């Protein structure tokens, strides 16, 4: 039985799907005007794990995540680069697939694009106008926020609270400062579409409502995204969707925590804006994913190299223990009864499922993986060789790998072979003889980065993999 924290009710609830055996998920995707940053990568990874766990439990998951390919940021980028909005969007959508693919994020069931749903968006807005939930004003269309009685229920704010910070910008012809834009009047030189309200383009919030409705129907099981989207984006989605559909928009709302960089908020002005496209050239994508899931999805993450290196070491311990089990398989027999180990392994998988059932607690799931790794090391050190036990170890390692999305083996092309290490040790010895200590230290540090430890022995320098 899976429970999850529902932002709408601010409590954990037992998950009950609309349709037995099926989960309909909508996850807000990126605005494709640039490469995604690690703040975008977090929900991609977190909700990929949620999807994987539902699938592990036997559910069919319809996973929809959109691309915002019409937006102020894209229009500004278009002017800056002197390229068309569609061309820029196409380029960064391709880059998105490459980046999240490197992070082992499964491809969504569907990735709808705003431009492909323009007719549906216009019809949706027209129906809101016809029902009195929206109004036209000098080429723009606004949603009548006060007409929707439940406004503020997701962010747990009253209309009076919201009114305090609301204002009408220059050029806006709103009835109320709380009203938000559904359709923007075209400006000279900007991409636009014909509509009954005049030429223009959709507002940000309406895009997700329409794509979710088109892909998943009136009511979806889970709507997810970053905490920064809770208000106003998700609040506005609820208002316009429920006004249009006359039904609850989503039964469960999930929001992941923020990412800080060295204890500071990530921002371009601070110069700590990290793009996935860049960081995966320096940090193994498997390590980055493992780092992300080592923290509960609702908790904030502090990104720094020390913590990433700790995640790297942790993942290497797991992989090394799995390699030992694989090597033991070649000499496995069924001579001795070792059912006690089967019981211990089964207790760990039960522990894993218990914590994942509790709001997808990947931090504790990783702890269960470490426990499995320790047990595997103990098993090998005792020179045990039961085929049954080794098979069960491998099976559970694979379950953890599949659910958490972290491969059991790294990219072999990135690993130094033994003969390469021996050559580097010889080169280091030669450098020390020649008093080239800078080169000797450089080789030592390079090997250390590969988690290879050098040891001085009476027989000479030896190495071991950490």
UniProtKB/Swiss-Prot annotation:
Taxonomy of the source species: Bacteria, Bacillati, Bacillota, Bacilli, Bacillales
Enzyme class: ligase
Organism in which the protein naturally occurs: Staphylococcus haemolyticus (strain JCSC1435)
Record-listed ATP binding positions: 268
Residue sites binding Zn(2+) per the record: 28, 208, 233, 237
Oligomer and partners: Monomer.
GO MF terms held by the record: ATP binding; cysteine-tRNA ligase activity; zinc ion binding
Coiled-coil boundaries: none
Reported cofactor(s): Zn(2+)
Record's keyword terms, sorted: Aminoacyl-tRNA synthetase, ATP-binding, Cytoplasm, Ligase, Metal-binding, Nucleotide-binding, Protein biosynthesis, Zinc
Protein name according to UniProt: Cysteine--tRNA ligase
Cofactor binding note: Binds 1 zinc ion per subunit.
PANTHER family, per database record: CYSTEINE--TRNA LIGASE, CYTOPLASMIC (PTHR10890:SF3), CYSTEINYL-TRNA SYNTHETASE (PTHR10890)
Predominant location category: cytoplasm
Chain ranges for the short sequence motif 'KMSKS' region as given in the UniProt record: 265-269
Biological process, per Gene Ontology: cysteinyl-tRNA aminoacylation
């Amino acid at each position: 039985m899976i429970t999850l924290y529902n932002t709408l009710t601010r409590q954990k609830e037992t998950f009950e799907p609309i349709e037995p055996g099926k989960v309909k998920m909508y996850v807000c995707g990126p605005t494709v005007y640039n490469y995604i940053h690690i703040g975008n990568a977090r929900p991609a990874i977190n909700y990929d794990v949620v999807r994987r766990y539902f699938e592990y439990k036997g559910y069919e998951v319809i996973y929809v995540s959109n691309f915002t390919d019409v937006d102020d940021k894209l229009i500004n980028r278009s002017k800056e680069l002197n390229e068309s909005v569609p061309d820029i969007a196409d380029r960064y959508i391709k880059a998105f697939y490459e980046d999240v693919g490197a992070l082992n994020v499964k491809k969504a069931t569907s990735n709808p694009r705003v431009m492909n749903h323009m007719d549906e968006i216009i019809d949706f807005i027209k129906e809101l106008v016809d029902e009195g939930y929206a109004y036209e004003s000098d080429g723009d269309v606004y949603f009548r926020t006060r007409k929707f009685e439940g406004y503020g229920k997701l962010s747990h704010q009253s209309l009076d609270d919201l009114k305090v910070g609301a204002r009408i910008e220059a050029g806006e012809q709103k009835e109320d400062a709380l009203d938000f834009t559904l359709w923007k009047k075209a400006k000279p030189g900007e991409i636009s579409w014909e509509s009954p309200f005049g030429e223009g383009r959709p507002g940000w919030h309406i895009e997700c409502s329409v794509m979710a409705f088109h892909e998943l129907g009136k009511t979806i099981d889970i709507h997810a995204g970053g905490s920064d989207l809770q208000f106003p984006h998700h609040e506005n989605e609820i208002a316009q969707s429920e006004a249009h559909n006359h039904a609850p928009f989503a039964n469960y709302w999930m929001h992941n925590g923020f990412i800080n960089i060295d204890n500071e908020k990530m921002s371009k002005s601070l110069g700590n804006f990290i793009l996935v496209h860049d960081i995966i050239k320096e940090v193994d994508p498997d390590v980055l994913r493992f780092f992300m899931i080592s923290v509960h999805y609702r908790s904030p993450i502090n990104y720094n190299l020390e913590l990433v290196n700790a995640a790297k070491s942790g993942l290497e311990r797991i992989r090394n223990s799995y390699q030992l089990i694989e090597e033991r398989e070649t000499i496995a027999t069924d001579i001795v009864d070792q059912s006690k180990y089967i019981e211990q392994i089964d207790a760990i998988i039960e522990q894993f499922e218990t914590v994942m059932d509790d709001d997808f607690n990947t931090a504790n799931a990783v702890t269960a993986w470490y426990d499995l790794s320790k047990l595997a090391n103990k098993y090998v050190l005792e020179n045990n060789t039961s085929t049954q036990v080794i098979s069960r170890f491998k099976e559970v390692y694979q379950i953890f790998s599949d659910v958490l999305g972290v491969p059991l083996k790294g990219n072999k092309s990135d690993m130094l072979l033994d003969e390469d290490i021996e050559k580097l040790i010889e080169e280091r010895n030669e450098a020390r003889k020649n008093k080239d200590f800078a080169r000797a230290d450089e080789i030592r540090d390079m090997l250390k980065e590969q988690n290879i430890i050098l040891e001085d022995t009476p027989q000479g320098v030896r190495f071991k993999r950490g």
